[in-house]
Amino acid sequence: MRHRKSGRHLSRTSAHRKAMFQNMAVSLFEHELIKTTLPKAKELRRVAEPLITLAKEDSVANRRLAFDRTRSKAAVGKLFNDLGKRYATRQGGYLRILKCGFRAGDNAPMAYVELVDRPVAGEVEAAAE
């Protein structure tokens, strides 16, 4: 029986799952918008949102924890220098999952995962001027 077991297996070993979500989180922090399958998107929330919450308080210990979970210096830098400050007043819900149809090959439900309050291309150009 699988009573009170949380999380999705996604037909992968635990090491593969850990590496996959680590890579997806780094990609999300770098690009602020990624496209993936709906179950992966829902599970990515459980990995990425605690990292953003951790980044709201900048300390050496928190940076080391974030690096341990992402293994990417660039992602940790962006988390603490940009995203932590951006979401300092937000209590949670840093990600938005938007359904975007089905994949052509296997009809898998697809979704966009994006950071809430991310700057849109038009706003970035206007702010630069």
Swiss-Prot record:
Keywords: Ribonucleoprotein, Ribosomal protein. It comes from Stutzerimonas stutzeri (strain A1501) (Pseudomonas stutzeri). Belongs to the bacterial ribosomal protein bL17 family. SUPFAM superfamilies: Prokaryotic ribosomal protein L17 (SSF64263). InterPro entries: Ribosomal_bL17, Ribosomal_bL17_CS, Ribosomal_bL17_sf. This is Large ribosomal subunit protein bL17. The lineage of its organism: Bacteria, Pseudomonadati, Pseudomonadota, Gammaproteobacteria, Pseudomonadales. One of its GO terms (cellular component) is cytosolic large ribosomal subunit. Part of the 50S ribosomal subunit. Contacts protein L32. One of its GO terms (biological process) is translation. GO terms for molecular function: structural constituent of ribosome.
